[in-house]
From Swiss-Prot:
Catalytic function, reaction form: 4 porphobilinogen + H2O = hydroxymethylbilane + 4 NH4(+)
The name this protein goes by in its record: Porphobilinogen deaminase
Any further remark recorded for this protein: The porphobilinogen subunits are added to the dipyrromethane group.
UniProt keyword annotations, A-Z: Porphyrin biosynthesis, Transferase
Note on cofactor: Binds 1 dipyrromethane group covalently.
Top-level lineage group: Bacteria
UniProt gene name: hemC
Pathway assignment: Porphyrin-containing compound metabolism; protoporphyrin-IX biosynthesis; coproporphyrinogen-III from 5-aminolevulinate: step 2/4
HAMAP family, alphabetized: Porphobil_deam
Taxonomic source organism: Bacillus cereus (strain ATCC 14579 / DSM 31 / CCUG 7414 / JCM 2152 / NBRC 15305 / NCIMB 9373 / NCTC 2599 / NRRL B-3711)
Disulfide bridge positions per record: none
Length: 309
């Protein structure tokens, strides 16, 4: 019986996601056993700076990918939105389980909705994507950066001067906390989700054919296709955490992919948005990127990167 070593970050959410996925594999009843190896990433250690200032995408995966390449672990369970657009040579996303709710969750201290927040209220987020879109809707709000895992951020909302914070609904759902803490779900027309938000990425070595066959049992083809379109768009624009960028794709009734893609200025004064429909994930992602580039997306990205330096 083969033992599969599964890499995970140490946070409660990461371990919850990892153990959930292992349970899906165990339920297949195949001759494998599993062991979780906890790995500390750079993103877990650097908590006093915004993600965009310390390298953005890849902060939560590099050490785990190193463990995959050196065969310390066999696979890793990541949040898809943490994954860089390009993976190291020899590694691949071997499985995308069914996506859960991709929306952002708005959590306020006193139960006020986003529209009801007082003028000048303080909104906590560590995401340029969220801050740009929400400032576009409410330029009067003050954005204050907030870092840490889910429980840390919820504690900071209670104890510090934040009036509200934004978290991913998916993480709260996986922890079983969504019904207790969420004031409202932000509609994706107000705040387009991050590329891959709500989805998991199971990363493994390309040459591990045995493991890839096992992972195929849990793969969700709809999630795989829609997330692929989002990630192609992200790759074409070379966007990471350093720029307000968003992409969310769904499957239409006739099996076409509908991708809404967005690039914004840091302060939310400019939001470029396009929706593309097609059958090929790569073509849809590239078309969305090309349309936004024609609107001036590259210039916005350059400006955002300069502001971060």
């Amino acid at each position: 019986m083969r033992k599969i070593i599964v890499g995970s970050r140490k946070s409660k959410l990461a371990l919850t996601q990892t153990n959930w996925f292992i349970d899906q594999l165990k339920a297949l009843g195949l001759p494998y056993e599993f062991e979780v190896k906890e790995i500390v990433t750079k993103g877990d250690v650097i908590l006093d700076v915004t993600l965009s200032k310390v390298g953005g995408k890849g902060l939560f995966v590099k050490e785990i990918e190193h463990a995959l390449l050196t065969k310390e672990i066999d696979m890793a369970v990541h949040s898809m939105k943490d994954m860089p657009a390009v993976l190291p040579e020899g590694l691949m996303i071997g499985c995308t389980p069914k996506r859960v709710d991709p929306r952002d969750a708005f959590i306020s201290k006193n139960g006020a909705s986003f529209k009801e927040l007082a003028e000048g209220a303080i909104l906590g987020t560590s995401s340029l994507r969220r801050s740009a879109q929400l400032l576009a809707a409410r330029p009067d709000l003050q954005v204050k950066w907030i870092r840490g895992n889910i429980d840390t951020r919820l504690r900071k909302l209670k104890e510090e001067d934040y009036d509200a914070i934004i978290l991913a609904t998916a993480g709260l759902q996986r922890m079983g906390w969504d019904n207790d803490v969420i004031t409202e779900h932000l509609d994706d027309t107000l705040c387009v989700p991050a590329v891959g938000q709500g989805a998991l990425a199971i990363e493994c070595r390309e040459d591990d054919k045995d493991l890839l066959q096992l992972l195929a049992h849990i793969n969700d083809t709809i999630t795989e296709r829609t997330v692929a379109a989002e990630r192609v768009f992200l790759h074409k624009l070379e966007g990471g955490c350093q720029v307000p960028i968003a992409g969310y794709a769904t499957l239409t009734e006739n099996d076409a992919i509908e991708l809404t893609a967005l690039v914004g200025s840091m302060d939310g004064s400019v939001l470029l948005k396009e929706t593309v429909v097609g059958t090929n994930p790569e073509e849809v992602g590239l078309e969305a990127a090309d349309r936004l580039i024609k609107q001036g997306a590259k210039e916005l990205i350059l400006a955002a990167n300069k502001e971060q330096q």
